[in-house]
Amino acid sequence: MLGGSAGRLKMSSSGTLSNYYVDSLIGHEGDEVFAARFGPPGPGAQGRPAGVADGPAATAAEFASCSFAPRSAVFSASWSAVPSQPPAAAAMSGLYHPYVPPPPLAASASEPGRYVRSWMEPLPGFPGGAGGGGGGGGGGPGRGPSPGPSGPANGRHYGIKPETRAAPAPATAASTTSSSSTSLSSSSKRTECSVARESQGSSGPEFSCNSFLQEKAAAATGGTGPGAGIGAATGTGGSSEPSACSDHPIPGCSLKEEEKQHSQPQQQQLDPNNPAANWIHARSTRKKRCPYTKYQTLELEKEFLFNMYLTRDRRYEVARILNLTERQVKIWFQNRRMKMKKMSKEKCPKGD
């Protein structure tokens, strides 16, 4: 060994610079390590004939380019295990949730029925998810999106509100698989329904008084007597939920609803093709009387006492002051003159 290294040093001192000199400096115990780190020697490192690099400048250039000092690795080979829950957060476990790394992609790719969970979806440990408390039984479809591979029980839920929660049961591998498959089908059905609803457009109010509409339909089809509407409304009140329209329990409102339900069957019994039955219930087209207010009546009486007949200009002025039309003022003065004439006849009979 010593003789070989001495021979190599002698060859290098004679001017032949090759990989023998580097080999003697490094040693034989780390050939495999350095070969893996630096790779095989390039074409420039092959042995060159003597006399090519005899000058001191070439020797200095060779030594400057070959700096094989062993360096310490930037990252150590063994990483220290990160604690699942820091000591500061251990005291306040109700406020801070530990970070849970996502599952590896290889595990999700091995199962074709699942997909990679996004960061917005809850982890299976959360009760709202299908693989947690909500889908632990494995029978009912979960409300949340389908989880990925099984994760820890105390995962983040990202503030998603838990929906209908089933009874908690020990989740096994078979139940998790079945619940994930059922949640996949339910989520796909919900997606199809939402897409169909969006394509149809706004077909009506989403939150309507279904119970009230059902009662009206039942009264319209089967109600023949005056109390059919009330029977339909009160008969189902004990078993079903109360109507969403009757949010205000005021006695006046209930009486009005009963009166409406009384009048509805009578109107529905009328035959639209029978004019003999409809003329009794016909509405008059005559305009209703619009009485004047006390202030308007007082001002008109003052004007009548001052002058029984008004000119057109004065009539327009009075109508503008009292917020009336010119026609109303003219008709009132006509009626007032007829009333005065009638009163004068009563006071002075013909015999006198």
Swiss-Prot record:
<dbReference type="InterPro" id="IPR009057">
    <property type="entry name" value="Homeodomain-like_sf"/>
</dbReference>
<keyword id="KW-0805">Transcription regulation</keyword>
<dbReference type="GO" id="GO:0048935">
    <property type="term" value="P:peripheral nervous system neuron development"/>
</dbReference>
<keyword id="KW-0804">Transcription</keyword>
<dbReference type="GO" id="GO:0005634">
    <property type="term" value="C:nucleus"/>
</dbReference>
<dbReference type="GO" id="GO:0007519">
    <property type="term" value="P:skeletal muscle tissue development"/>
</dbReference>
<dbReference type="GO" id="GO:0005654">
    <property type="term" value="C:nucleoplasm"/>
</dbReference>
<dbReference type="GO" id="GO:0000978">
    <property type="term" value="F:RNA polymerase II cis-regulatory region sequence-specific DNA binding"/>
</dbReference>
<dbReference type="GO" id="GO:0009952">
    <property type="term" value="P:anterior/posterior pattern specification"/>
</dbReference>
<dbReference type="InterPro" id="IPR050803">
    <property type="entry name" value="Abd-B_homeobox_TF"/>
</dbReference>
<keyword id="KW-0371">Homeobox</keyword>
<dbReference type="GO" id="GO:0048704">
    <property type="term" value="P:embryonic skeletal system morphogenesis"/>
</dbReference>
<keyword id="KW-0597">Phosphoprotein</keyword>
<dbReference type="GO" id="GO:1990837">
    <property type="term" value="F:sequence-specific double-stranded DNA binding"/>
</dbReference>
<dbReference type="GO" id="GO:0030879">
    <property type="term" value="P:mammary gland development"/>
</dbReference>
<dbReference type="GO" id="GO:0007338">
    <property type="term" value="P:single fertilization"/>
</dbReference>
<dbReference type="GO" id="GO:0045944">
    <property type="term" value="P:positive regulation of transcription by RNA polymerase II"/>
</dbReference>
<feature type="compositionally biased region" description="Gly residues">
    <location>
        <begin position="126"/>
        <end position="143"/>
    </location>
</feature>
<dbReference type="GO" id="GO:0035137">
    <property type="term" value="P:hindlimb morphogenesis"/>
</dbReference>
<dbReference type="GO" id="GO:0006351">
    <property type="term" value="P:DNA-templated transcription"/>
</dbReference>
<comment type="function">
    <text>Sequence-specific transcription factor which is part of a developmental regulatory system that provides cells with specific positional identities on the anterior-posterior axis.</text>
</comment>
<dbReference type="InterPro" id="IPR020479">
    <property type="entry name" value="HD_metazoa"/>
</dbReference>
<feature type="region of interest" description="Disordered">
    <location>
        <begin position="229"/>
        <end position="276"/>
    </location>
</feature>
<dbReference type="Pfam" id="PF04617">
    <property type="entry name" value="Hox9_act"/>
</dbReference>
<feature type="compositionally biased region" description="Gly residues">
    <location>
        <begin position="229"/>
        <end position="238"/>
    </location>
</feature>
<protein>
    <recommendedName>
        <fullName>Homeobox protein Hox-D9</fullName>
    </recommendedName>
</protein>
<dbReference type="GO" id="GO:0000977">
    <property type="term" value="F:RNA polymerase II transcription regulatory region sequence-specific DNA binding"/>
</dbReference>
<dbReference type="GO" id="GO:0000785">
    <property type="term" value="C:chromatin"/>
</dbReference>
<dbReference type="GO" id="GO:0003700">
    <property type="term" value="F:DNA-binding transcription factor activity"/>
</dbReference>
<dbReference type="GO" id="GO:0006357">
    <property type="term" value="P:regulation of transcription by RNA polymerase II"/>
</dbReference>
<dbReference type="InterPro" id="IPR017970">
    <property type="entry name" value="Homeobox_CS"/>
</dbReference>
<dbReference type="InterPro" id="IPR001356">
    <property type="entry name" value="HD"/>
</dbReference>
<feature type="region of interest" description="Disordered">
    <location>
        <begin position="126"/>
        <end position="208"/>
    </location>
</feature>
<dbReference type="GO" id="GO:0000981">
    <property type="term" value="F:DNA-binding transcription factor activity, RNA polymerase II-specific"/>
</dbReference>
<keyword id="KW-0539">Nucleus</keyword>
<dbReference type="GO" id="GO:0035115">
    <property type="term" value="P:embryonic forelimb morphogenesis"/>
</dbReference>
<dbReference type="GO" id="GO:0008344">
    <property type="term" value="P:adult locomotory behavior"/>
</dbReference>
<feature type="modified residue" description="Phosphoserine">
    <location>
        <position position="146"/>
    </location>
</feature>
<dbReference type="Pfam" id="PF00046">
    <property type="entry name" value="Homeodomain"/>
</dbReference>
<keyword id="KW-0217">Developmental protein</keyword>
<dbReference type="InterPro" id="IPR006711">
    <property type="entry name" value="Hox9_activation_N"/>
</dbReference>
<dbReference type="GO" id="GO:0009954">
    <property type="term" value="P:proximal/distal pattern formation"/>
</dbReference>
